Amino acid sequence: MSAQEPDATAQTAPPELFVLRDQEGPILYAPLGNLIARANEPAVAAALAYAHDPSTLDSMSEDERAVVETLGERGFFKHRAYPRHVVGFRPVQVTLFPTNNCNLRCSYCYAFGGEGGGNGEPLTRMDLEVAQRAIDLIARNARQRMDDGDPVRNFLVSIHGNGEPFCAYDLIREIVWYGQDVAEELGVPAVFNAATNGVLSEEQLDFVIANFHSVNISFDGLPEFQDANRPIAGGRGSFRRVDHTMRRLCEAGMDFGIRTTVTAAMVDRMPEIVAFVAENYPGIEQLHFEPVWECGRCVTSDNVMPRSDVFTQRYLESLEVARERGVRLVFSGARQDMVVDTFCKVSSGSFTVTPTGDVTACYEVSYRSDPRSERFFFGRFDHELGDFVFDQAKLDALSELNVHNIRYCDDCFCRWHCAGDCAAKVLDGIALEEHHGSVRCDISRALTLNQIQRKLDWRPTDG
């Protein structure tokens, strides 16, 4: 099934009713109610007239009235408010960046991993005390929120990085052991996950399999792409090492996903990547495709972002292969099954700690020298106090980074799904009111339309 650029801006109605059009005609879509219906043009005209002014029902024909009443019975005209739940900054999850050192030199790395962010900042690693106090904070919050009746079942420690976190393997072990001790002491389960480039030793693999609940591997899908884009520091290819890691994880039955960064040179082979992954790493949790974003080391390399229309078409072709092979394929901006008001947790106090002890709301903003840190950094670890200090004014400002405040998204049918996209990308150096989207919007709209079309085409099977 091909996707067509939806016409969704001209006809919207007050109760979040959008009219999309594809090659088969109009589609009525109410995202907050997850309601979808194909309709002809007279039905669309009647529905929009009623949505804007219910008194028009009196002057409608019998057929128009029947359409409006049927749609109304199914909830298309119901005014729905997005349920916003504000609990203050009481995180039960933390993402720790153990180090900015890295054993790879990926040609498009947003953080210049292994090179201090590209701004001359030194290679460093997190103090164990910083990690311990972060775990204390989220574990106490989890215990308190569980006692208060909140739907909290555990605390989560994610290992990530502006480098390869397992370059600080001894620190990671101490972090995990400490978290397990705290979990036992407070009676709150601890969950550990990690993002890694997959270049791990046997000892590290044994530890991951024994102690982590899930892992996400950055892997570019085919041996030649992996070796070219993600070489080991010094220039050797990394495919053999990462392939071994993923086969070990498969053998252990461990949940893991693959994140593939797609460049213009790779885009036409996306379906082949899906087939290769399905054949060689059976049972992976998901395969995640993202077009490269031209920042960091990518700016000085030959890698460029694929054209949005080409990425979209190859993604749809890949989706067919994925369905045939039993692979879950995802793109971050296309998630019609989710109703959200923020793309990520940046506006709800995402608690991420950099190697220097700074607290950022965004994985992509991890250095003080990054101009975006003025917006996204909202705290730090104070060694004299032995605890974290947070800037409430910064937290308040971050809480405004949601789709309710993005006028550009008002008339977009994806507004409650992609929710304005990644703030670090689309708000780079500009104010929220200047948000004007990006080429990623074209991809998100086309792929979300495709998800809507698939729901319309779905039929229950016998049995």
Describe each model-derived feature in a short phrase.
Residues 46, 50-60:
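Short acidic, hydrophobic short linear motifs in intrinsically disordered regions
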Residues 3-38, 60-95, 148-151:
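N-terminal [4Fe-4S]-dependent radical SAM core
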Residues 131-162, 168-292:
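Radical SAM/AdoMet-radical enzyme domain recognition
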Residues 133-160, 435-463:
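Short Fe-S-cluster ligation motifs
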Residues 88-89, 93-130:
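Canonical Radical SAM [4Fe-4S] cluster-binding loop centered on the CxxxCxxC motif
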Residues 102, 106, 217, 357:
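Conserved, mostly hydrophobic/aromatic
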